[in-house]
From Swiss-Prot:
Organism (species): Rhodococcus jostii (strain RHA1)
Intrachain disulfide bonds: none
Keyword Transmembrane recorded: no
Secretion signal, residue range per the UniProt entry: none
GO molecular function, one term: serine-type endopeptidase activity
The name this protein goes by in its record: ATP-dependent Clp protease proteolytic subunit 2
Reaction(s) catalysed (UniProt annotation): Hydrolysis of proteins to small peptides in the presence of ATP and magnesium. alpha-casein is the usual test substrate. In the absence of ATP, only oligopeptides shorter than five residues are hydrolyzed (such as succinyl-Leu-Tyr-|-NHMec, and Leu-Tyr-Leu-|-Tyr-Trp, in which cleavage of the -Tyr-|-Leu- and -Tyr-|-Trp bonds also occurs)
Catalytic site positions: S92 (nucleophile), H117
EC number(s) recorded for this UniProt protein: 3.4.21.92
Subunit structure and binding partners: Fourteen ClpP subunits assemble into 2 heptameric rings which stack back to back to give a disk-like structure with a central cavity, resembling the structure of eukaryotic proteasomes.
């Protein structure tokens, strides 16, 4: 009989061991470094076995829109399903990625908090540059609202209204809103992910 940890020793990092189980973890602010790491992990695991799910655990305050969109696009690009698990805090881009998991495979742990708001950015420079950046920012805001609507079943207008200011959700409220498909308190309740 072999165990899931056969061949591993104590010097293996926790994250390496999780990766071998097809579990990846976003436990920081979303930036280019973590986005590149997660994208590489998703691509690697998808190439290794496109028939097995990847489980992405999210405990993140959010962060960079462009870095988050790289993760989002890679999740959609992967041949295998990416199941998402909200734990602790899934705010801003963390919420966006949580709701972007494979339909039917988006989970929140019971005490997770989910927060949605409109994207924000600091803009500076010449008047012409500010006008260009403002136009790009408006496009990004609209695009994100459309994607959240697609993943939650809400209308774009509802997402736009609800994200005007910080809007907080309990795990149960996130389920009712459509960010997640299940609230689970035990791994066995999320059957089939990472197996």
């Amino acid at each position: 009989m072999t165990s899931a940890t056969a061949g591993l020793n104590l010097s293996d990092s926790v994250y390496e061991r999780l990766l071998r189980e097809r579990i990846i973890f976003l436990g920081t602010q979303v930036d280019d470094d973590i986005a590149n790491k997660l994208c590489a992990q998703i691509l690697l695991l998808s190439a290794e076995d496109p028939s097995r799910d990847i489980s992405l655990y999210i405990n993140s305050p959010g962060g960079s829109v462009s870095a988050g969109m790289a993760i989002f696009d890679t999740m959609q690009f992967a041949e295998c399903d990416v199941a998402t698990f909200g734990m602790g805090l899934a705010a801003s881009m963390g919420q966006f990625l949580l709701s972007a998991g494979a339909k039917g495979k988006r989970y929140a742990l019971p005490h997770a908090r989910i927060m949605m708001h409109q994207p924000s950015a600091g803009i500076g420079g010449t008047a012409s540059d500010i006008a260009i950046m403002a136009e790009q920012f408006a496009h990004t805001k609209r695009e994100m609202a459309e994607l959240i609507a697609e993943h939650t079943g809400q209308t774009v207008e509802q997402i736009t209204a609800d994200s005007d200011r910080d809007r907080w959700f309990t795990a149960q409220q996130a389920l009712e809103y459509g960010f997640v498909d299940h609230v689970v308190s035990r791994a066995a309740q999320a059957g089939g992910t990472g197996q």
